[in-house]
Amino acid sequence: MSDLKSRLIKASTSKLTAELTASKFFNEKDVVRTKIPMMNIALSGEITGGMQSGLLILAGPSKSFKSNFGLTMVSSYMRQYPDAVCLFYDSEFGITPAYLRSMGVDPERVIHTPVQSLEQLRIDMVNQLDAIERGEKVVVFIDSLGNLASKKETEDALNEKVVSDMTRAKTMKSLFRIVTPYFSTKNIPCIAINHTYETQEMFSKTVMGGGTGPMYSADTVFIIGKRQIKDGSDLQGYQFVLNVEKSRTVKEKSKFFIDVKFDGGIDPYSGLLDMALELGFVVKPKNGWYAREFLDEETGEMIREEKSWRAKDTNCTTFWGPLFKHQPFRDAIKRAYQLGAIDSNEIVEAEVDELINSKVEKFKSPESKSKSAADLETDLEQLSDMEEFNE
């Protein structure tokens, strides 16, 4: 390390200051995989990835499975780290110990804090986060931001005032401005549930409530939609779509589909078949049948297997195991969804560099001068006279 770098690092007041390649922020980050491959891809852009530290927001209308998806991530974190603790800030009071157990979360490892206002959430959260040391395993779960009033809104109601609260968005921004640095410096994932609403425009948009604060602070924002899964006229469940509104790892506006059925819960294989079809590693040799294809890396040829499968028979490790172990399939997923470095064209860069460094030259006017307006008028008169003569 150069003397200048050493002196600058030594002069810093932060204990975490280090050369970027040796920084804990980039080299000591937890990656927590869930039991749902499509969720892992939505979180990181690759099958082997998953949830990392930072603020993750799940937003959507009522009954869009937001809390369930959030608890699925909490369960995965606590399963990976048996000594982990969950800080649960509760404003909806709909999650019971029995419900937590059904989602794979041990209630004895959950610290439950009922909150009634944004100000209370801000004070409690910053005090608890400040007490955590980096390396201690903690996951934060907020259910929900959309249901939290500001202190002023509550006071206005008690004083029988009916004016609109113009401070809520400002308070929300203050909350995340204070707590977000803790998530990165202490390697803590925070999963927050939020609501959405439709804008009042000719072509309405689905946007997240709470102002700009949550969106600015979040590493990932999923806006969740859903559609019915039916067998004839019988409703069997719902297909939820994770719309990537913001992400630091995945291409924005990507969509990831996850099926939840009444008789089996979350389908861990949901979304994979359509994705593999789109990427070209699964084909339909005939209607209703599917076959895998593998890339021969020596010839670049896609080799199709002889066996064909029905769609319902593909939901198994027998079908997906060979594809998950196939590196070109993993690489194709990363190319399709993961944010990568900006590609550069060396030839174009060299041309632009040459233009920038070229010498200034004095402009030389062309030898043949353009005609004046008077000359053009004379030409037009002559042309008109010739036309009259020909007639």
From Swiss-Prot:
GO terms, molecular function: ATP binding; ATP-dependent DNA damage sensor activity; single-stranded DNA binding
Swiss-Prot/TrEMBL keywords: ATP-binding, DNA damage, DNA recombination, DNA repair, DNA replication, Nucleotide-binding
Sequence segments annotated as region (Disordered): 364-391
Compositional bias segments (type: Basic and acidic residues): 364-374
Entry similarity comment: Belongs to the RecA family.
Function: Important in genetic recombination, DNA repair, and replication. Possesses pairing and strand-transfer activity. Interacts with dda and gene 32 proteins.
Protein name according to UniProt: Recombination and repair protein
Species the sequence originates in: Enterobacteria phage T4
Gene name tied to this protein: UVSX
